C-alpha cells in the first residue's frame, strides 16, 4: 500500500481500495463500479488522469455518445471484427466528424477510461464534478525512458524487466 501511503502523505483525505470484482473488469464496468462506490461514499469530485481535455470536453463527449446510443448496438452487430472502441470511433466519425470530442476521447486508454467515468457519472443520482488531470511527460504506452519527461508505466516495466537504462530508471523511480 505504498501508493496509498504517498497519497495520504500528500494531502489525500482518504484512499479507497477497489474490490477485485471491479478492478478486473472491462473499462465500462470498471468505471461503473468506481463511480458507484465514489457516489455512495459521498464524493463530490471525480479526478482522473488523461492525455487531454477538461470537464467540458468530457461532458461534450458524453453528450455525443448519448446522441448515438441507439445506433451503437446496431453498429456493433454489423462490425463484430473490430474492438468496441474501434467500432464506437468509426460511428462517432461518421456522425460527428474526425475532430469531435467523442472521437478524441476514444484515442487512448486513459481518454477511454475518462469517457467511461463521465458516462457513468452522468447516469448517477448525484453526479460529481469531473476533474481531468492532464498527463505530463510520456504517453501512456510510450516504452522508452527519457531523462526529460516522466516515464510511462510501460517504459518503467520494460526497463525493470530488461535491466536497462539503470541511471534513467533510478531518476524516474525517484518520483515514485
Give the location of each predicted region:
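Active-site cores that bind ATP or allylic diphosphates and position pyrophosphate for catalysis
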Residues: 18-176
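A glycine-rich helix N-cap at a beta->alpha junction
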Residues: 9-20
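N-terminal catalytic cores of NTP/NDP-binding nucleotidyl/phosphoryl-transfer enzymes
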Residues: 1-3
